Amino acid sequence: MCVRVPATSANLGPGFDCLGVALDLANEFEFCEADRFRCVVHSTVSPEDARQVATDERNLAWRAFTHLFEHLGKTPPTVALTVMMHVPLGRGLGSSATAIVGGIAAANRWLGSPLSTPEWLLLASRLEGHPDNVVPAALGGCQLSILGETLLTCALDWHPQIALVLAVPDFALATSKARAALPKTVPHTDAVFNAVHLALLVRALATGDARWLAEALQDRLHQPYRTGLIPGWQDVRAAALEAGAWGVVISGAGPSVLALTHLDCAEAVRQAMASTWPNACLYCPGLDPNGCRVEVEAG
């Protein structure tokens, strides 16, 4: 059984912990029945990334796999797990969500799909702690989600002329460190600011309206507290805006940076960001419309 789960970029500015988009870059998790647990990790990103992933029973995909079995009161099988990593670790691209979704989706299919997609997605979101990466990783596209006693998800329209430019720097930022930078409370005016801008962003993404997007991508809940953790943020943001980007946001907890621009400007924005961050990898990723895919080998 092989599970392919896309990378994600969460928040998109004002959508803190509730908004995310699936990208056309994915990790793959292969589960095969075996006589003893084994885990092998390969990375096309870097050998260092592969070394950072646990290959014992602490492996996150394996823990997610067994979590669903235990949730249903079942004994998990012994498997050989192979992980093929294409999503870099610690860059704000939802690598942990790929493991959680991959493990839970595989376990559900292994058992004959006893849980509906909303049911196992709730389990995955609770395991992750927030749904902004997990939901688009599972469902694809751009997703708005709310996690409470239940999980509510809403697929958002994405105008075809909106392009993404992603800058992935050559340094990592631990999500725990990025979370620790956030205050426990924020001014009421900042909360109102984000509520208004998130509402506008939903319409702006659907219409592709340039003025709306330029306004809507602003944030006061998390980015002002995290930009100091990303060396070069101000310069790469300024370069992207100068080249025609509507807005520039931190991808997830960072340190990757995501620019939104018109399709016709994407290459100019990519080159401008690359000239400012010469050691970063620059992409113009498309959206993954499908999300998690499970393939079961016949026989």
UniProtKB/Swiss-Prot annotation:
GO terms for biological process: threonine biosynthetic process. Its main location: cytoplasm. One of its GO terms (molecular function) is homoserine kinase activity. Its EC number is 2.7.1.39. ATP binds at residues 88-98. It catalyses: L-homoserine + ATP = O-phospho-L-homoserine + ADP + H(+). It holds the Pfam family GHMP_kinases_C. Belongs to the GHMP kinase family. Homoserine kinase subfamily. Catalyzes the ATP-dependent phosphorylation of L-homoserine to L-homoserine phosphate. This is Homoserine kinase. The gene is thrB.
